[in-house]
Amino acid sequence: MERRQDRIRNFCIIAHIDHGKSTLADRIIELTGALSEREMQDQVLDTMEIERERGITIKAQAVRLNYKAKDGKEYIFHLIDTPGHVDFTYEVSRSLAACEGAILVVDATQGIEAQTLANVYLALEHNLEIIPVINKIDLPSARPDEVKKEIEDVIGLDASDAPLISAKQGINIEEVLERIVRDIPPPKGDDTKPLKALIFDSLYDNYKGVLAYVRVFDGVVKPNMTIKMMSTGAQFTVTEVGYFKPGMLIPCEELRAGDVGYIAASIKTVRDTRVGDTITDANNPADEPLPGFRKLNPMVFCGIYPTGDTKYEELKEALEKLQLNDAALFFEPESSAALGFGFRCGFLGLLHMEIVQERLEREYDLNIITTAPSVVYRVTKTNGEVLYIDNPTKLPPPNEIDKMEEPMVKATIMVPNEYVGAIMELCQERRGIFKDMSYIETTRVILTYEMPLMEIVYDFFDALKSRSKGYASFDYEFIGYAESNLVKLDIMIKGEVVDALSFIVHRDKAYQRARKIVEKLKEEIPRHLFEIPIQACIGSKVIARETVKALRKDVLAKCYGGDVTRKKKLLEKQKEGKKRMKQIGEVEIPQEAFMAVLKLEE
């Protein structure tokens, strides 16, 4: 007897940036007739303006499509669109857990890239059936046969009969759909067991509250049921369930095992629907949650302060709204003597940080200034206490610190042969430890390094691209903490420490860094009527200094000839005045000076 599930296929599309994932999704949506031609637009699933502009997918999306296969049966497809970027690896892994299969899109002109690898390994960990598809075969520079061989060599997937498609021209898309029906297994699961549903994303809707995007593994969920989140124990009453059509929510009576859809239960914040959590029936709960849930910890921190005509309250409101849709964003109020009141924010990684900053500026029209990004250090004090420090100003004094550890990542870099030297040199400059090197065919190399996250946070990505003329691709994962010789560098202006400019740096690099900063500040701080010393120090030892010279009035202008003692008297008087001014004068540090130094940090 055929079960209802036998006609369901849950799958996602994995690809490196720009290999044509969203375009393929567009074609599949078009072919299955989910949208009329009038509603069709490019990158249907990328709803955020930034997603379209950068050509990246940030939030996971899911759509239900109906497909009449060549065997005459009608199938239900659930296409779950995943983010492709390293910062969102956890979201990707949850989206993959909601599927039984994945389509691996590889660009016929580029071959395999670092992020493709990272996501494929994730898919293999979840035991997904992977269908390799070679895209962009309409381009003159396409080399499908080499790419097939590459897929076999590097990933070990049989790609001999991989569909050759062009998502842009719509060539061979049917073949992909038939392969989905043929190769991807239908969902397992039993709708008579207690409810188990995996949350793989959540979205805040102004009318319905938080919508949890779920994949139902066992059981049934329908309105008026009481559901329970297994990680927090919070309970809610379901108000509506349904599934997704592109850009629309379609309410339905129930979601059964194997279905992908949404649950609305008048939940107030996204915090309550944690990605990766299991939803179960409060009256008949499941014994244990689905595996793989973990709490997201921010890896990169920076301060965000309002500037110009932006008010603190506006910034707070904007961050709260962003947080509704972005459970990984963390922020707490912070004040700095130099920048006033603002927030300390935590992010999953660099791209996440950039996107949040960009959304604040674009969607909420705010003027903000961000301090240099820092990572979370683990500090062991001499009395044995262990602290996690994300803000250099909170570091205990040097005499109380027993050891400092910094987060390390495993970086995988794929690079063409001719740039290997340059890239290895870059990794060494960034205190990387060489681990492994392997060749793909004869033209490309996979390098594996262990590196401090701190070195990647600044501008590793840009440096990598510029030294490899844009050909290298890169992926990283956190592996743990390692002890390191770190110091806190303070910048003193006229003898006072400026908190916004303090940062933690490796001892070997402290001097160059300090030199650069004091020189930059000297250019940026306007001259006052007294001289201003700018010093960079570690503890009480000054390691670099510049002085902004004083402006002086020409007091001798009115003495034409005259006696030298008269001139001396006037000069002495001026000197006295300057000395007094220096004691009581305040230094105005313009906002531009901060910006310049923080940019130089990069």
UniProtKB/Swiss-Prot annotation:
This is Elongation factor 4. GO terms for cellular component: plasma membrane. It holds the Pfam family GTP_EFTU. It comes from the Bacteria. PANTHER family: TRANSLATION FACTOR GUF1 HOMOLOG, CHLOROPLASTIC, TRANSLATION FACTOR GUF1-RELATED. SUPFAM superfamilies: EF-G C-terminal domain-like, P-loop containing nucleoside triphosphate hydrolases, Translation proteins. Residues 6-188 form the tr-type G domain. InterPro entries: EF-4, EFG_III/V, EFG_V-like, EFTu-like_2, G_TR_CS, LepA_C_sf, LepA_CTD, LepA_IV. It is a peripheral membrane protein. Belongs to the TRAFAC class translation factor GTPase superfamily. Classic translation factor GTPase family. LepA subfamily. One of its GO terms (biological process) is positive regulation of translation. Required for accurate and efficient protein synthesis under certain stress conditions. May act as a fidelity factor of the translation reaction, by catalyzing a one-codon backward translocation of tRNAs on improperly translocated ribosomes. Back-translocation proceeds from a post-translocation (POST) complex to a pre-translocation (PRE) complex, thus giving elongation factor G a second chance to translocate the tRNAs correctly. Binds to ribosomes in a GTP-dependent manner. It comes from Caldicellulosiruptor saccharolyticus (strain ATCC 43494 / DSM 8903 / Tp8T 6331). GO terms for molecular function: GTP binding; GTPase activity; ribosome binding; translation elongation factor activity. Its EC number is 3.6.5.n1.
